[in-house]
């Protein structure tokens, strides 16, 4: 299909795709890379019954918000499409995307009360990232393709990680790998490396120590705000379940504040890491368990724990059927749901919302500037709480 359309982008949808409504009436969904208000020439990729899918081939009239992308690899790399926006504009557009996406699930007053926390820096914020290695050199995935583009720098990576990226790649075979740097020491690692990263959480006078391949929040600076928000939302609740806990990003600060915490994590290695951190820090009130919460039997210890509240931070794919499992815990009064994909979260939270659980706070953190991704906190209270 080589048909070209002249379109005006009405708004951005989830995942950064543009929406246009030409005179024909059928909606056109445009691949990421456009901004609201822009006029574009677009190539049709597929024509479906209810909508047409297209990609921009030329920006005819750019948005006033568009600015030059600072990265020399931007034309080939698909990892930072929002890099043409200033951080403040990026946060506003993400808030609009969130409100639009959630409008079919959440009440208008909840969306009107959305709090937006911008990123403290727009670039050089990631202390963990992924690279594709080919012939000992770092590469990035191309725009909506499996093509690999060579990298000499990445503006998303923290300075020590970006500076050592090429050296780290030389130690790896072909494939996709996680690389990371310690915010405390700036020492760099590949996921195959020995040693460990020190991840300070200064507001709670503690640090996490994790092996190089362990997941942690890449934007460690804004993660401090995320932790503060979660801990504040759980003020007044003494017994807290931390579900999908990782190595203790929330469990250990909560324990430091005197909570009794049961942390449940699907990765047994991450759960052991969390337990090791708790012992090292003298936080005996934090218990870590390795268990797959997709299995009904894994919920028995959680129910037996009698949590008054829970924080959950599931993977991007969500946690199917978790709503029913949570509602089966009669002691629960509050949920603090941390989400990196609100579409999946709203799907999973639907049983709770239908049962009358109410959202008392909704927060967007621009955890991933330069990209369409965001982190969202949703606080839900039991209707009879």
Describe the residue ranges of each PLM region:
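Short acidic-glycine loop/turn motifs at beta-strand connectors
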Residues: 23-24, 48, 133-137, 143-145, ...
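Residue-level signal for inorganic ion chemistry
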Residues: 20, 37, 80, 341, ...
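Solvent-exposed residues in well-ordered beta-strands and their adjoining turns
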Residues: 45-47, 59-60, 132-134, 211, ...
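Hydrophobic beta-strand signal
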Residues: 41-43, 130, 241
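Terminal RNA-binding accessory module
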Residues: 1-73, 145, 288-289
């Amino acid at each position: 299909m080589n048909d070209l359309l002249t379109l005006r982008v009405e708004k951005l949808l989830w995942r950064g795709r543009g929406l246009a409504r030409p005179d024909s009436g059928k909606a056109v969904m445009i691949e990421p890379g456009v901004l609201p208000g822009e006029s574009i020439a677009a190539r049709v990729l597929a024509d479906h019954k209810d909508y047409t899918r297209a990609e921009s081939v030329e920006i005819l009239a750019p948005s006033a918000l568009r600015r030059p992308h600072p990265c020399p690899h931007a034309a080939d790399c698909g990892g930072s499409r929002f890099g043409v926006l200033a951080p403040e504009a990026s946060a506003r557009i993400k808030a609009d995307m969130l409100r639009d996406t959630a409008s079919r699930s959440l009440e208008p007053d909840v969306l009107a009360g959305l709090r937006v926390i911008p990123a403290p820096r727009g670039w050089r914020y990631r202390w963990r990232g992924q690279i594709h290695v080919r012939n000992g050199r770092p590469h990035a995935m191309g725009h909506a393709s499996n093509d690999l583009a060579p990298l000499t720098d990445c503006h998303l990576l923290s300075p020590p990680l970006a500076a050592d990226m090429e050296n780290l790649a030389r130690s790896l075979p072909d494939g996709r790998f996680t690389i990371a740097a310690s915010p405390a020491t700036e020492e760099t690692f590949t996921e195959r490396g020995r040693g460990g990263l020190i991840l300070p959480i200064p507001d709670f006078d503690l640090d996490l120590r994790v092996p190089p391949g362990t997941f942690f929040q890449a934007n460690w600076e804004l993660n401090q705000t995320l932790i503060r928000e979660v801990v504040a939302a759980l003020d007044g609740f003494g017994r807290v379940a931390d579900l999908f806990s990782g190595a203790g990003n929330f469990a250990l600060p909560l324990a430091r504040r005197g909570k009794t915490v049961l942390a449940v994590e699907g990765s047994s290695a991450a759960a052991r890491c969390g337990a090791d951190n708790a012992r090292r820090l003298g936080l005996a009130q934090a218990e870590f368990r390795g268990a797959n919460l997709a299995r009904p039997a894994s919920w028995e210890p959680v129910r037996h724990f009698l949590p008054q509240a829970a924080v959950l931070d599931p993977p991007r794919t969500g946690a199917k059927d978790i709503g029913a499992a949570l509602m089966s815990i009669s002691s629960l009064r509050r949920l603090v749901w941390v989400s990196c994909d609100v579409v999946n979260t709203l799907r999973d939270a639907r049983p709770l919302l239908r049962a009358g659980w109410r959202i008392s706070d909704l927060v967007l953190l621009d955890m991933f500037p330069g990209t369409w991704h965001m982190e969202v906190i949703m606080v839900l209270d039991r209707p009879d709480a």
